[in-house]
């Protein structure tokens, strides 16, 4: 599985930037990862061309870690892009192209925090796939 995370704007909050960098470093031990930052929401889709598209959206489906793991296993061998919008969310065109609209929480999360939570969950899924004991159900 080849993962790409495309986010609007680089994290400016120190804790988010450091956390995203740390989880990206850890994830690359288990799978190829591209971490791409764009300036505007309209730039997300071109960066996800040829990928399954998982769009983070507060109106999306809430999945457990195990459900996300199973969904990604079903896409094994494919390229999967996770699209994280900016402070204004996603343009409608991005939501319409989604293979999966995913909500990380019923709470509204600041976009940098949402990116950090996504990175941790992707790391968790990859360690689960590898049989590493990081995830404890």
UniProtKB/Swiss-Prot annotation:
Catalyses which reaction(s): pseudouridine(1915) in 23S rRNA + S-adenosyl-L-methionine = N(3)-methylpseudouridine(1915) in 23S rRNA + S-adenosyl-L-homocysteine + H(+)
GO terms under cellular component: cytoplasm
Stored CDD domains: RlmH-like
One protein family per Pfam: SPOUT_MTase
GO molecular function: rRNA (pseudouridine-N3-)-methyltransferase activity
E.C. number(s) listed in UniProt: 2.1.1.177
Entry keyword set: Cytoplasm, Methyltransferase, rRNA processing, S-adenosyl-L-methionine, Transferase
Localization per Swiss-Prot or TrEMBL: Cytoplasm
Binding residue positions for S-adenosyl-L-methionine: 56, 85, 104-109
Coiled-coil parts of chain: none
InterPro entries listed in its UniProt record: Alpha/beta_knot_MTases (IPR029028), RlmH-like (IPR003742), tRNA_m1G_MTases_N (IPR029026)
Protein role: Specifically methylates the pseudouridine at position 1915 (m3Psi1915) in 23S rRNA.
Assembly information from the UniProt record: Homodimer.
PANTHER family assigned: METHYLTRANSFERASE, RIBOSOMAL RNA LARGE SUBUNIT METHYLTRANSFERASE H
Family: Belongs to the RNA methyltransferase RlmH family.
The protein, known as: Ribosomal RNA large subunit methyltransferase H
Lineage: Bacteria, Thermotogati, Deinococcota, Deinococci, Thermales
Gene of this entry: rlmH
């Amino acid at each position: 599985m080849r993962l790409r995370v495309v986010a609007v704007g680089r994290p400016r909050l120190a804790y988010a930037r450091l956390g995203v960098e740390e989880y990206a470093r850890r994830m690359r031990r288990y799978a190829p990862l591209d971490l791409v930052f764009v300036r505007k929401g309209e730039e997300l889709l071109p960066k996800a061309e040829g990928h399954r598209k998982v769009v983070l959206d507060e109106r999306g489906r809430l999945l457990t870690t195990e459900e996300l793991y199973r969904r990604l296993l079903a896409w094994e061998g494919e390229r999967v892009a996770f699209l994280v919008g900016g402070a204004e969310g996603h343009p409608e065109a991005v939501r319409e192209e989604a293979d999966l609209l995913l909500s990380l929480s019923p709470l509204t999360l600041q976009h940098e925090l949402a990116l950090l939570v996504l990175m941790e969950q992707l790391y968790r899924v990859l360690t689960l796939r590898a049989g590493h004991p990081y995830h404890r159900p």
